[in-house]
């Protein structure tokens, strides 16, 4: 049974050394998997933050890594990447991996068992981290701004305010130094007790209130 990829991005690592455990061809091109990586992959179930980019190298040879992805392999050997993964995390019989996509076929030196150096694009990682932090702060500011529009308790966010974010957020796309979130004001939100009519009527005022709270 293969082992899951050991990840170190949570500790802020940008570099590492590891052994290539498999090289696969998929709908995303050539995917290199290593035993341990500092690369942060895009989450295929909630793809808010893009995966890290960077390089794999060995003895003067270098290949570029496109956006790192989630991958998985079954006990029977089925390999899948990103949205093609047919199961949820935690399902027995599957091992979870980080895939490093490269352009074209793998060069002759990039084979199973090879030792490689991994390097993440640091400025891009930092920009995405700032964008992710700003996204969370903005959502908390929005929850504060919309707190009086709830007629029922929707549950609380991390600051104890009514959690509009959790109820209405449909998608979040983080980019360097920012993010774009989309919200749905549908029947389910109204049934949950949110006053969508007042929200629409006072959108301009709420916008400036949210900006003020965010800046504060």
Task: Label every model-predicted segment.
Residues 1-216:
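Active-/binding-site microenvironments in catalytic and ligand-binding cores
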């Amino acid at each position: 049974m293969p082992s899951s990829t050991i990840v170190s991005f949570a500790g802020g690592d940008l570099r590492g050394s590891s052994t290539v455990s498999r090289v696969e061809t998929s709908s995303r091109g050539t995917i290199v998997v290593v035993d341990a990586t500092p690369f942060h992959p895009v989450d295929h179930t909630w793809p808010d933050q893009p995966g890290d980019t960077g390089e794999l190298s060995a003895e003067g040879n270098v290949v570029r890594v496109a956006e790192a992805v989630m991958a998985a392999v079954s006990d029977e050997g089925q390999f899948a990447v990103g949205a093609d993964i047919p199961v949820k995390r935690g399902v027995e019989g599957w091992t979870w991996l980080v895939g490093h996509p490269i352009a074209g076929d793998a060069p002759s030196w990039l084979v199973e068992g090879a030792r490689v150096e991994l390097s993440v694009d640091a400025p891009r990682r930092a920009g995405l981290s700032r964008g992710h932090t700003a996204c969370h702060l903005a959502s908390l500011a929005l929850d504060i701004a919309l707190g009086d529009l709830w007629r029922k308790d929707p549950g609380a966010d991390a600051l104890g305010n009514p959690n509009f974010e959790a109820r209405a957020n449909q998608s979040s796309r983080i980019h360097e130094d920012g993010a774009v979130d989309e919200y749905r004001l549908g029947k389910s939100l109204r049934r949950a007790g949110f006053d969508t009519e007042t929200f629409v009527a006072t959108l301009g005022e709420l916008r400036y209130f949210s900006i003020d709270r965010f800046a504060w």
